A protein has these predicted regions:
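Helical "substrate-binding/catalytic lid" subdomain
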Residues: 1-72
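Long, low-complexity C-terminal extensions of enzymes
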Residues: 64-66, 70-95
């Protein structure tokens, strides 16, 4: 249970931190993500997380993925996390 909670809560919270850093670097208030965060969390009450997953990795939108990886060129850690998460999302969406 603890390991699952680390993935479902601790890691997700850290992704909020990373997303906030990306916005704040551009002078954008990270609180703008709150409606999306709330909507995403609410969806899993009505459908599985797998069914609720959206985004370029699910669609395998290679143009968007490559553009966003390029935007992360100066931050290898975020770039690696983005690539690994995108790959995992894509693999799970095919199942």
């Amino acid at each position: 249970l603890h390991l699952a909670a680390v993935f479902a809560c601790n890691f997700v919270n850290h992704l909020y931190v990373l997303g906030g850093e990306l916005l704040e670097k551009e002078g954008i208030d990270a609180r703008l993500l709150l409606p999306l965060i709330d909507e995403t969390a609410a969806k899993v009450h009505d459908m599985s997380p797998l069914a609720a997953q959206t985004g370029p990795a699910v669609r395998y939108d290679e143009n968007v993925i490559q553009k966003q990886l390029a935007q992360l060129e100066a931050d290898p850690t975020k770039r690696e996390i983005y690539a690994l998460m995108s790959q995992s999302i894509h693999q799970h969406s095919k199942s």
